[in-house]
Amino acid sequence: MTSQVSSILSQISSPTDLKKFSLAELSLLAEQMRHKIISVLTNTGGHLASNLGIIELTIALHYVFSSTEDKFIFDVGHQAYPHKLLTGRNTEEFDRIRHDGGLSGFTSPSESIHDLFFSGHAGNALSLALGMAKATEDSRTHILPILGDAAFSCGLTLEALNNISSNLSKFIVVLNDNNMSISQNVGVMSKNLSRWIHHPKFNLFSRKIEKWLTKIPRYGNSISRRSHKLSICLKSLFCPIPIFEQFNLAYMGPVDGHDIKRLISVFQTARDLPFPVLIHVYTTKGKGLEIAQENPEKYHGVTANFNSSKENKFLPTIKPQLTYPDIFGQTVCTLGEAFPNLHIVTPAMSLGSRLEAFKEKFPNRFIDVGIAEGHAVTFSAGIAKAKSPVICSIYSTFLHRALDNVFHDVCLQGLPVILAIDRAGLAYGDGCSHHGIYDLSFLRAMPNMVICQPRSAVVFQQLLQSSLQWNMPVAIRYPNIAATQRDPIATDVHMHRDPGVGEILSQGEDVLILGLGHMCNTALSIKLQLLTHGISATVVDPVFVKPFDNNLFSILLMHHSKVIIIEEHSIRGGLASEFNDFLATYSFKVDVLHFGIPDAFFAHGDKESLLKRVGLDTESMVKRILTHFNFRTKTSPSNKLSIV
């Protein structure tokens, strides 16, 4: 990159600085921003392809509108990196985005006045924008929801579309269409519109008419602005009317999302229109990075130290340890062969949930419904009702959106839908909108629901296979971390498991430790550290949060009066809550120390520091255990350790 290019970005401290530059310089700025994002994400990881594709669009928005006076509402928010660079956040904090001391990977009001909402989930921007438009309808404020094409598959977006009033003014919907979702659906429409809108004779005619109208004394400018609505009506006589017009949105586009001059012109026109408008912008996801343009889904999100060079992309790399999603993807392929009518359903998360192999192997039994979590669950219920086994693969944080569907269409009907709840636990780099730490709270309350979590790869495979035979609603939750491969207790992947049966992993005398899922490893580590203090612990994997193994724990509590519970879930409504209900029901009097996620929102961070922040690191827990139970070590002459 040249020093000239570098100097442009360094001169941007706020969006108003954009006005200092020519169109040619703004194009150089886009190049610099692209280079900056690639360079930073090579070190930090993050959402790559979507941010590379929206740079020129973001520059044009900030050039025409004011993000402090007008309201920019980014749907999802993971495509806001260019927005951050233009709003005073081109700092060392940007260089550590998604990490300790760095910026959030999403819009965040705690960072900047230019960010209106904490974001992370898709489809809500239009509803939020309509609410703000209603509250500010008498002001000069422009409301600009910025949606990706995938957001238009969300039911929430369609509900919002149905509530748009033609009386709205200063309401501009920006549709960033990067060919990842609805493009095929509107392909014929877009081709007709594009052919008509960009026809030289029509554009020449339109310009002459508008120029003539502006010359009318007193009313010319007003009539000219309204002539745009007339031109849209004329186009509708010759080509299909865009669906957006049926929802009181005047359609403008398609517009090349990488042509800054054209974008600025279109936004300036839309700014002065007295009715709601949708601007359809075509962008290229991964723009400027060839490997990302060729495979935008793969490079939607990247890990730190990803290889951005196409020439070197086939260099050998160290193969990471298999994660729980990897185990899930492999296991469902095996189950797909054993169960010839097994269906897998996912709401737009096939790659993240490692379902590409199943999709390729069994294309007729793999269904990606798009960003429609509620539909995914209810669709799965329909498959189950038709007597076919079905697994609905869904992220914990997105399952929130399907709560009623789980209750009404699965549990109430008693249908054997298996919910494979991915990303259960802290989301680390993604932060508070993505932590999967609330699902137990609402799933526990639902009758007929079995809830379990594996501690190892073997137990995970056992649960997946066994659950297909339970004939009831099941939730199997698991994190996106390396799966424990060696399990001395569970060795046979084909062993059948019955609901509600826990396992003792290690015997002791002084304290009982329950670890949920992968936290069993932490519990065993704590046991070893407690041994150095002369404290002997029994470690148990309940496996099932519901039904809880009342028989096993009734026996264990006859010999233990001190209990420790460790879970990577909110302290409200998780394993500890189930255990406390058990204690109350059976009138056990024991001292319980609970380690979980405190009742607060936690921002992004590196794994070790975030675990320490919430009190789930081993060192912090051991200190608290020793203090809470007032453990002190004594060594008898026989070297036998006793606790007083």
Swiss-Prot record:
It comes from the Bacteria. Its cofactor is Mg(2+); thiamine diphosphate. Binds 1 Mg(2+) ion per subunit. GO terms for biological process: 1-deoxy-D-xylulose 5-phosphate biosynthetic process; isopentenyl diphosphate biosynthetic process, methylerythritol 4-phosphate pathway; terpenoid biosynthetic process; thiamine biosynthetic process. Thiamine diphosphate binds at H78, G120, H121, A122, A150, A151, N178, E373. It is an enzyme of class 2 (transferase). One of its GO terms (molecular function) is thiamine pyrophosphate binding. InterPro entries: Dxylulose-5-P_synthase, THDP-binding, Transketo_C/PFOR_II, Transketolase-like_Pyr-bd, Transketolase_C, Transketolase_CS. Pathway: Metabolic intermediate biosynthesis; 1-deoxy-D-xylulose 5-phosphate biosynthesis; 1-deoxy-D-xylulose 5-phosphate from D-glyceraldehyde 3-phosphate and pyruvate: step 1/1. It catalyses: D-glyceraldehyde 3-phosphate + pyruvate + H(+) = 1-deoxy-D-xylulose 5-phosphate + CO2. The keyword Iron does not apply. Its EC number is 2.2.1.7. Coiled coil: none annotated. Keywords: Isoprene biosynthesis, Magnesium, Metal-binding, Thiamine biosynthesis, Thiamine pyrophosphate, Transferase. One of its GO terms (cellular component) is cytosol. Mg(2+) binds at D149, N178. SUPFAM superfamilies: Thiamin diphosphate-binding fold (THDP-binding) (SSF52518), TK C-terminal domain-like (SSF52922). Belongs to the transketolase family. DXPS subfamily. Catalyzes the acyloin condensation reaction between C atoms 2 and 3 of pyruvate and glyceraldehyde 3-phosphate to yield 1-deoxy-D-xylulose-5-phosphate (DXP). HAMAP family: DXP_synth. Homodimer. This is 1-deoxy-D-xylulose-5-phosphate synthase. The lineage of its organism: Bacteria, Pseudomonadati, Chlamydiota, Chlamydiia, Chlamydiales.
